[in-house]
């Protein structure tokens, strides 16, 4: 299979890792030869008003164990995306389509692709279901 891009990049929290996370990583890898995943640090999540169930070092290890992922780095700020795209010579930035349009500012540095989310599953939904039990 001839892939369109050489280096892909995506970012996320990846708390309570589920099939939707796996699907987006698989589809992101299908676009390129090498996939870099930035996992949001606990400190960055607190800045965004999010509290994770799983600490960042564990979330990074989980993502690193996925066969579609070639490199895992911590994400510590919003500005890091531009820095990383330049630093790693990223050809394609990949996100779920729930973020559609939010990362178009990266188009001056690389292609930006929004992939459809896996329906019926999200970390927010899982947290709500667990809270109700």
Regions found by a protein language model. Name each.
Residues 1-133:
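Nucleotidyltransferase catalytic core that binds NTPs
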């Amino acid at each position: 299979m001839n892939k369109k891009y050489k280096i892909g990049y995506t970012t996320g929290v990846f708390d309570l890792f589920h099939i939707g996370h796996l699907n987006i990583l698989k589809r992101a890898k299908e676009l390129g030869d090498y996939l870099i995943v930035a996992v949001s640090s606990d400190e960055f999540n607190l800045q965004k008003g999010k509290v994770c169930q799983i600490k960042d070092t564990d979330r990074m290890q989980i993502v690193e164990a996925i066969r579609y992922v070639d490199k895992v780095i911590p994400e510590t700020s919003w500005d890091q995306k531009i820095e990383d795209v330049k630093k790693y010579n990223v050809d394609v930035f990949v996100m779920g389509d729930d973020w559609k349009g939010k990362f178009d500012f990266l188009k001056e540095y690389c292609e930006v692709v929004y992939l459809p989310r896996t329906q019926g599953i999200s970390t927010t939904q899982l947290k709500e279901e667990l809270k109700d039990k």
